[in-house]
Amino acid sequence: MSIDHARIWFGVALIVLCTGVGLPSLAEESTGPPAAPIAKQESVLDAMVKSLTGDVYAEPSTWRELSLGTVFSEGWREPWVSAPRGGGGAPRQGVLNAFDGVFLRLGIVTYGYTNNFLENGSQNTGSLELYLPFNRRFEIRTAIPMVVSNRGATGTNYMSNFGDYVITPRVILSETQNVTQSLNVAFRTPTGNTFNKNGVAAVTPTYEFWSNWWQGLVVRGGVGFFLPYGHQSITEVGARTAFTANVAPGYYFTPHDFTPFGDLVWYVSTNLVHLIDDRGPKTTSVSLTPGVRSHLGQNWYLLSAVEVPVTKPEPFDYQVQVGLMKVF
């Protein structure tokens, strides 16, 4: 292992220890203080069915804390229920271009526009993401890239294709009223076209957290690695191995029922990508994404964000994202 790799792994371990062991990603709209009822064990199938179809927001009193020490023995045969609001009163929700940390049950359709993509015109994307909890410990997140349209790195005509499908198993490491920690492993499949800079096979393990101790302030983030593999990914597309990190503080200004501006949160997400392989310069890229999210009513949410690179080289000038979400 190189010195650079050792430093990165040491940093990851330090972050996990500081945020996890030293502490005492909807759970969308549950309120009330957390309780600690006796766990009711179900069959694996029953727990999955109730997690996916049950009224998981009606009885927040059935929620209880999960500890890191029982990650292999507790919660796997219990239906997922929405966790209560954090200690400061903020709901557990997701936002655009930031790590989740918490479990959710929802679907979101997202449109993205990228200006000056690879210095060769614009890029337009459309995707559908689903968050599907199977029990209190395990969830599947899927990202279906319905369309990716750009001129590639050197093309003169726009080409539209299906993108790279991503499926992400997620495990809750621990959860209290104030903090949720999760381990996620995203599997990117090369279903897209290399012309669009897709067709990449990669594994991306991440550690993520969500926290709320004081009023409407929520801090989320995490660290991970982007690990591409295969001849097409590395040689044809030029995918690079990278260390990634994210932190996204935000503040909630309105109550849930103040529609169409309910649960109004403004946030700024900072994303860092540091290339760590030997296939080129080991550059570090940083971008800032200010964003907003609001509850329109009937568990429909509107999300928007603008990502702006702040380091060079810049892969694009700016990227606009808009999402329409339904919590179910």
Regions found by a protein language model. Name each.
Residues 1-2, 22, 266:
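Charged interaction patches that mediate protein-protein contacts
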Residues 2-10:
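Bacterial N-terminal signal peptides that target proteins for export
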Residues 11-20:
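Bacterial N-terminal signal peptides
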Residues 23-27:
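Sec/Tat signal peptide C-region and signal peptidase I cleavage site
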Residues 28-328:
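Transmembrane beta-barrel domains of Gram-negative outer membranes and organellar outer membranes
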